[in-house]
Amino acid sequence: MAGAPHPHTYMGWWGSLGSPKQKYITQYTISPYAAKPLKGAAYNAVFNTFRRTKNQFLYVAIPFVVVWSIWTRARDYNEYLYTKEGREELERVNV
């Protein structure tokens, strides 16, 4: 073996370099003119985004409504405690 092997020569996998030349290896490709990777991308982006958002809406809306209602009740109760009518209850709560 004098010199470097030809670039198209199979040298073998790691640990067993220098194996015999491989036979009957076939490579299949598709023409770049036949493949249309972005066909319908804009159309599908709009409708797929709408469908996915619609399907996830309740998973976001229900917890939002629950947290919002708890937050507003707590805010209103806090405002009530610091009014003239709520002072007595505030004294009871802050034992």
Curated annotation (Swiss-Prot):
Name the source's superkingdom: Eukaryota
InterPro entries in the record: Cyt_bc1_su8 (IPR004205), Cyt_bc1_su8_sf (IPR036642)
Task: Kindly state a single biological-process term from the GO annotations of this entry.
Answer: mitochondrial electron transport, ubiquinol to cytochrome c
Is this entry keyworded Mitochondrion? yes
Q: What is its main location?
A: membrane
Question: One GO molecular-function annotation for this sequence?
Answer: ubiquinol-cytochrome-c reductase activity
| One of the record's GO cellular component terms | respiratory chain complex III
Query: Topologically, how does it sit relative to the membrane?
Result: Single-pass membrane protein
Keyword terms, alphabetized: Electron transport, Membrane, Mitochondrion, Mitochondrion inner membrane, Respiratory chain, Transmembrane, Transmembrane helix, Transport
| Description of what induces expression | Expression is up-regulated in cells that undergo morphogenesis to form pseudohyphal cells when co-incubated with macrophages. The promoter contains the conserved motif 5'-TGAAAA(G/T)GAAG-3' found in morphogenesis up-regulated genes involved in energy generation including ATP2, ATP3, ATP4, ATP20, QCR8, COX4, and SDH1. Expression is repressed during formation os spider biofilm. Expression is repressed by HAP43.
- The membrane spanning regions, by residue number, are 57-74
List the effects observed when the gene is inactivated.
Leads to decreased vegetative growth on several carbon sources including maltose, citrate and acetate.
- Localization: Membrane; Mitochondrion inner membrane
Q: Assembly and interactions?
A: Component of the ubiquinol-cytochrome c oxidoreductase (cytochrome b-c1 complex, complex III, CIII), a multisubunit enzyme composed of 10 subunits. The complex is composed of 3 respiratory subunits cytochrome b (COB), cytochrome c1 (CYT1) and Rieske protein (RIP1), 2 core protein subunits COR1 and QCR2, and 5 low-molecular weight protein subunits QCR6, QCR7, QCR8, QCR9 and QCR10.
Function, please? Answer: Component of the ubiquinol-cytochrome c oxidoreductase, a multisubunit transmembrane complex that is part of the mitochondrial electron transport chain which drives oxidative phosphorylation. The complex plays an important role in the uptake of multiple carbon sources present in different host niches.
The similarity annotation says:
Belongs to the UQCRQ/QCR8 family.
Q: What is this protein called?
A: Cytochrome b-c1 complex subunit 8, mitochondrial
User: Which organism's genome codes for this protein?
Assistant: Candida albicans (strain SC5314 / ATCC MYA-2876)
